[in-house]
């Protein structure tokens, strides 16, 4: 257990605990992942996404903390599935930490094998940003969720969700962004979760507006708000596998239907219908196989209801939790007849190297984030959608843990922003260094055929070289810490992905690292999509001077 049994909270201010700011940044971000304001179950080291953890167990956590505190500026700490396994002498431009989480040999890459190894204390589920120490609470996915719903509005509802009702489920660390994202797009949302504490947490952080005690009340509130054209988010305690069929029985068809339950993990992330949380915990402990079987059956029934709502006119899409795959495996042959959110709404942004870029103020002072917001508004004043996002984020988003900001910046923009931030740290305009990172859900850092790389133009959905190349090139470029994970978002066997973090500490060395890393990282996203044949990515590469040998050869041959 935690040695002093006190809540974990990252240190604030400019006094160092570690030997350098990069090590200090890793230490603070590890602790921030487990802050009670941030993590879903910090007492279990669980950050978000079912059982996505920051460290394998408490001894490993304390060993990591100790290692980061004593790590020299030319050493690298190796983390194997949440456990520190070695410190090697490297060099000052090398990452201070390299992490590999949840990786299994492909033929063994399934939940059954993972759970066996997990019970033996040999592995840990890192999700995406849980095990890579760059989770910032629900804000981390808010803009991506907003961009998804905004694009859905552009394609189907004339550019706004005003006068529409979205029904979704799952209000955990990721799904909790949905109600705020929908209301930011001027829509109405009914958000279902089996766990009242999750609903309460979203209320506390102003992501949810109200709580309905019955489905009848939720529908009445939603229809009234829709009629009046006002944005409103409604939390409803319930099981989506029961609520969606009941909506069908009542003849209630929402405008949009999706789902962000933790369906990627049938044992720990989804409650079978007919069970209370307490009953589910007992069955999970006493007969996990029976629990998994019932959970999968319930998922299939939920997907059947989603398919029927689609037939009745709702816009339905998968939000990347692999629920369609489970339903398909359970015999629902048309489970994939509604699309995933990436091919439906997000991929064009990936072609420009855009994705969920984020930064965190190690000072703990919200004023530092206010100043970085101003940088975005000044440096990118010609990008009105981006500036509009920053203005909305300032108005609506509450910080969880260390103050942070998320916004989707693309190739060229990230390096430009990083340079400016480093200058502000150097001048003292910002009171302490800034951590810059991103979600693993990014343009060139993930292979996930049921999510980020679904329906690739050239059929390369399952090609997993790209996240490996991403981790390698970011390591070579001098990222502060780099991670390679398996199974995030969609579960064991369905994804490989990489993360990176780079620290702006105001030094000339940091400036060079920032320039390299914030170029190679989004650059590979452009390359990955250009290689798959996306014209927008090819044009972006040509316009920005990214060297792609195949394109260069084509140019010479055509010239």
UniProtKB/Swiss-Prot annotation:
Cofactor: NAD(+)
The UniProt record lists the keyword Endoplasmic reticulum: no
A Pfam family recorded for this sequence: Urocanase_N
Broad class of enzyme this protein falls into: lyase
Pathway field: Amino-acid degradation; L-histidine degradation into L-glutamate; N-formimidoyl-L-glutamate from L-histidine: step 2/3
Key words, A-Z: Cytoplasm, Histidine metabolism, Lyase, NAD
Cited InterPro entries: Urocanase, Urocanase-like, Urocanase_C, Urocanase_central_sf, Urocanase_CS, Urocanase_N, Urocanase_Rossmann-like, Urocanase_sf
EC number annotated for this UniProt entry: 4.2.1.49
Cellular component per GO, a single term: cytoplasm
Cofactor comment text: Binds 1 NAD(+) per subunit.
UniProt similarity note: Belongs to the urocanase family.
Functional note: Catalyzes the conversion of urocanate to 4-imidazolone-5-propionate.
Name of the featured protein: Urocanate hydratase
Protein source organism: Shouchella clausii (strain KSM-K16) (Alkalihalobacillus clausii)
Taxon lineage: Bacteria, Bacillati, Bacillota, Bacilli, Bacillales
Gene name as annotated: hutU
């Amino acid at each position: 257990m935690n040695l002093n049994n006190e809540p974990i909270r990252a240190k604030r201010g400019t006094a160092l605990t570690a030997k350098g700011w990069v090590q200090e940044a890793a230490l603070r971000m590890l602790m921030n992942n487990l802050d009670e304001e941030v993590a879903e179950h910090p007492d279990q080291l669980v950050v978000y996404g079912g059982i996505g953890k920051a460290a394998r167990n408490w001894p490993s956590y304390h060993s990591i903390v100790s290692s980061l505190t004593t790590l020299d500026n030319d050493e690298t700490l190796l983390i194997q599935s949440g456990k520190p396994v070695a410190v090697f002498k490297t060099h000052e431009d090398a990452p201070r930490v390299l992490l590999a989480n949840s990786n299994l040999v492909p033929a063994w890459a399934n939940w059954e094998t993972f759970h066996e190894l997990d019970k033996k204390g040999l592995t840990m589920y890192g999700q995406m940003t849980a095990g890579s120490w760059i989770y910032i609470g629900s804000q981390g996915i808010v803009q991506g969720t907003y961009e998804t719903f905004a694009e859905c509005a552009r394609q189907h509802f004339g550019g706004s969700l005003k006068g529409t009702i979205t029904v979704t489920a799952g209000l955990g660390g990721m799904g909790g962004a949905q109600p705020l994202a929908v209301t930011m797009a001027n829509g109405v949302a009914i958000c279902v979760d089996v766990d009242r504490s999750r609903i309460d947490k979203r209320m506390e952080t102003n992501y949810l507006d109200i709580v309905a005690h019955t489905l009848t009340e939720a529908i009445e509130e939603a229809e009234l708000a829709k009629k009046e054209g006002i944005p409103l988010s409604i939390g409803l305690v319930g099981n989506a596998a029961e609520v969606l069929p009941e909506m069908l029985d009542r003849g209630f068809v929402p405008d949009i239907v999706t789902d962000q339950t933790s369906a990627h993990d049938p044992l720990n992330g989804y409650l079978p219908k007919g069970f209370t949380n307490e009953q589910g915990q007992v069955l999970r402990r006493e007969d996990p196989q029976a629990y998994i079987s019932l959970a999968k059956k319930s998922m299939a029934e939920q997907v059947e209801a989603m398919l029927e709502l689609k037939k009745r006119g709702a816009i339905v899409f998968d939000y990347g939790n692999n629920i369609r795959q489970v339903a398909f495996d359970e015999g629902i042959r048309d489970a994939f007849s509604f699309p995933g959110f990436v091919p439906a709404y997000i991929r064009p942004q990936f072609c420009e190297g855009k994705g969920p870029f984020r930064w965190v103020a190690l000072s703990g002072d919200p004023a530092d984030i206010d100043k970085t917001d101003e940088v975005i508004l000044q440096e990118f004043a010609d990008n009105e959608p981006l500036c509009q996002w920053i203005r909305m984020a300032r108005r609506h988003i509450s910080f969880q843990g260390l103050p942070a900001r998320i916004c989707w910046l693309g190739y060229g923009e990230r390096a430009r922003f990083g340079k400016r931030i480093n200058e502000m740290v150097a001048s003292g305009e910002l009171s302490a260094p800034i951590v810059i990172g991103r979600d693993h859900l990014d343009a060139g850092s993930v292979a996930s055929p049921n999510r980020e790389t679904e329906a690739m133009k050239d059929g390369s959905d399952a090609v997993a070289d790209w996240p490996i190349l991403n981790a390698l090139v970011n390591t070579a470029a001098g990222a502060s810490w780099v991670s390679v994970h398996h199974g995030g978002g969609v579960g064991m066997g369905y994804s490989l992905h990489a993360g990176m973090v780079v620290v702006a500490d105001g030094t000339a060395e940091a400036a060079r690292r920032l320039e390299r890393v914030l170029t190679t990282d989004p650059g590979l996203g452009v390359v990955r999509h250009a290689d798959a044949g996306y014209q927008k990515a090819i044009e972006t590469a040509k316009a920005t001077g990214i060297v792609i040998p195949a394109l260069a050869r084509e140019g010479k041959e055509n010239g």
